[in-house]
Amino acid sequence: ATYCKNIGVKYLTVYAFSTENWKRSETEVSAIMALLKKYLLEAVDTMERDHIRLHFFGDMTPIAPELRALAHETDEITEHLSKDDFQANVCLNYGGRDEILRAVRRFAAECAEGKRKPEDLDETLFSTYLDSAGIPDPELIIRPSGEQRLSNFLLWQCAYSEFYYTDTLWPDFDEEELDKAIAAYQSRDRRFGGVKK
């Protein structure tokens, strides 16, 4: 996150744990959660100093109370930081389909309460119900480990994202690899559905 901030990236979103990852072995899930706890403890100590905001995407209800408390603590620190500071988004117990369903349920509940009408809904309003509300859609999605699939990641938000695939495994994905991905992205002509000029 610090390197991204230093080279001028404004937002970074990482897929830490998906809704499907609960299907992994208990040992593997425990190891991932232990790593997350370590990361969050470090974040609590360094966020203010480094001016790094932290935001979570996903349904936090099944997450262990200790991790939820740490996430809440990072939320409180983020509240005191400038909106202009770098922001790291962590997808935790996140799935793109689940995010869309949760957004639809929130909108439907507001319709049932008379706060909204179905005809109010457009893309802009719908985006306010997503975990990523107020955050720009990603310009670049990097897929490491030789995989060439979305894996249920930011399904709504990636409509016009550029994709970069690499065989480099996630643990080995370093600053040099990130620089390669950014250089590849910068060489592209983004048309957002239009024609090349």
Feature roles, as predicted:
Residues 1-197:
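Flexible, compositionally biased loop and terminal segments
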